[in-house]
């Protein structure tokens, strides 16, 4: 990718650090827990996901790889807005008639490390099925293409494992959150 400073050929995060350096970081708000060390870096990214009716895709010679089983967008209590992915998970499971046991993989976006930890505490999902290739702290948080990145990561991993279903959830800003369940075809 070309940028003003030349060619960008490597990821800008993660930087070298230590536990001592992380412990010295100030929280975002006085008395808070979130610091730059517990947050994902905002990274450059671009993505495209083609959504189409299955018949139209086939008419165009395209092979559908997955279908959307259910999805939702919810508003969370603004003071507790980081709980949104948990509430969205409950809503999308109810809409689909599925349970956590029906889901093979989970992608839970983590703008802050506490989001996925809270989600795990609430839902008690198997941590070995959550963000199996790393979450936003490891991979970056490409604002504007995070949903596409999560969905694509989930679909590729379903194909690698020959698994069937994934649940993707993330904060959507302004105390909103979304969740989607996909089924590999």
Regions found by a protein language model. Give the residues of each.
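Beta-strand segments within the central parallel beta-sheet cores of soluble alpha/beta enzyme folds
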Residues: 1-4, 62-73, 101-110, 129-135, ...
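N-terminal extracellular/periplasmic Venus flytrap/periplasmic-binding protein-like
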Residues: 1-59, 122-129
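Short glycine/threonine-rich loop-to-helix capping motif typified by GTGT followed
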Residues: 7-13, 78-85, 110-128, 142-146, ...
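Structural signal for hydrophobic packing residues in well-ordered secondary-structure cores
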Residues: 26, 72, 93-96, 116, ...
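Active-site pocket-shaping loop/turn-to-helix segments
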Residues: 34-47, 69-95, 104, 108, ...
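Conserved beta-strand-centric core segments of catalytic alpha/beta enzyme folds
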Residues: 35-52, 147-185
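Short, glycine-/Ser/Thr-/acidic-enriched flexible segments
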Residues: 55-57, 137, 173
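Phosphate/pyrophosphate-binding loops at sites that engage ATP/ADP/AMP, CoA/4′-phosphopantetheine
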Residues: 57-64, 90-105, 120-124
């Amino acid at each position: 990718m070309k940028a003003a400073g030349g060619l960008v050929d490597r990821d800008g995060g993660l930087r070298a650090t230590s536990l001592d350096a992380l412990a010295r970081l100030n929280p975002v708000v006085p008395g808070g827990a979130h610091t730059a060390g517990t947050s994902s870096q905002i990274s450059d990214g671009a993505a495209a996901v083609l959504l189409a009716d299955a018949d139209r895709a086939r008419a165009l010679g395209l092979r559908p790889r997955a279908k959307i089983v259910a999805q939702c967008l919810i508003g969370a209590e603004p003071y507790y807005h980081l709980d949104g992915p948990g509430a969205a998970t409950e809503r999308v499971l109810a809409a689909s008639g599925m349970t956590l046991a029906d889901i093979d993989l989970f992608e839970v976006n983590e703008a802050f490390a506490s989001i996925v930890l809270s989600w795990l505490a609430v839902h008690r999902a198997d941590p070995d099925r959550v963000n199996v290739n790393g979450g936003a702290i490891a991979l970056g948080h490409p604002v504007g293409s995070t949903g596409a990145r999560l969905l694509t990561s989930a679909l590729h991993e379903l194909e690698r494992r020959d698994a069937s279903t994934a649940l993707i959830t993330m904060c959507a800003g302004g105390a909103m959150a979304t969740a989607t369940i996909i089924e590999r075809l």
